[in-house]
Amino acid sequence: MPGRFITLEGGEGVGKSTQAKALAAALRARGLDVVETREPGGSDGAEAIRRLLLEGAADRWNARAEALLFAAARADHVARTIRPAIEAGRWVVCDRFLDSSIAYQGGADGLGDEAIRTLHAIGSAGYLPDRTLLLDMPVFDAAFRQAEAGIANSDRFEKRDEAFHDRVADSFRRIAAQEPARIRTINAQGSPQEVTARLIEALADLLP
């Protein structure tokens, strides 16, 4: 049975981390061998870069520096964690991947898609997921969810202003419209169980 690479994407507060864990558990319940990972991070080198990217003031890095750091972390992550797992026939569920760089640095911060994809081609040979699940909900509702959970403004990106997060959401929707074969947009509102069921449904054609 071939391994599969599944990514979860979306803006701040849409529930990616919660749903990545729930999706991995649901896939294991179906008898699949699943690796859970995240970006930035997922390998020793990438986790070190994660700390550089997420800690500190919102303006610690400019968009170009961020894009380079993300690409470096991703290159190590793909080489050391993702590709070996896929080649061993395992399923990989990853909280964020390339599309986040396109939406955040490429779209919201104005570097453009081409620059981000060029870095990805250099660092990770253009490696792409088998399926990307984009969790989508209004930015205001996502921010309210974070505030209720007491996790608002916990890293550099969450500290950015509302206009930035609106641009991120718009960029994700644009990317999804451009790549409908790979990306499925999932309504992130409702109970966690309802959202997980939508994720599983969006993977139906890949499941054994």
From Swiss-Prot:
ATP binds at G10, G11, E12, G13, V14, G15, K16, S17. It is an enzyme of class 2 (transferase). GO terms for molecular function: ATP binding; dTMP kinase activity. The lineage of its organism: Bacteria, Pseudomonadati, Pseudomonadota, Alphaproteobacteria, Sphingomonadales. Phosphorylation of dTMP to form dTDP in both de novo and salvage pathways of dTTP synthesis. It catalyses: dTMP + ATP = dTDP + ADP. Keywords: ATP-binding, Kinase, Nucleotide biosynthesis, Nucleotide-binding, Transferase. Belongs to the thymidylate kinase family. InterPro entries: P-loop_NTPase, Thymidylate_kin-like_dom, Thymidylate_kin_CS, Thymidylate_kinase. The keyword Nucleotide-binding applies. Its EC number is 2.7.4.9. It comes from Rhizorhabdus wittichii (strain DSM 6014 / CCUG 31198 / JCM 15750 / NBRC 105917 / EY 4224 / RW1) (Sphingomonas wittichii). The keyword Nucleotide-binding applies. Pfam families: Thymidylate_kin (PF02223). SUPFAM superfamilies: P-loop containing nucleoside triphosphate hydrolases (SSF52540). The gene is tmk. GO terms for biological process: dTDP biosynthetic process; dTTP biosynthetic process; dUDP biosynthetic process. GO terms for cellular component: cytosol. HAMAP family: Thymidylate_kinase (MF_00165). This is Thymidylate kinase.
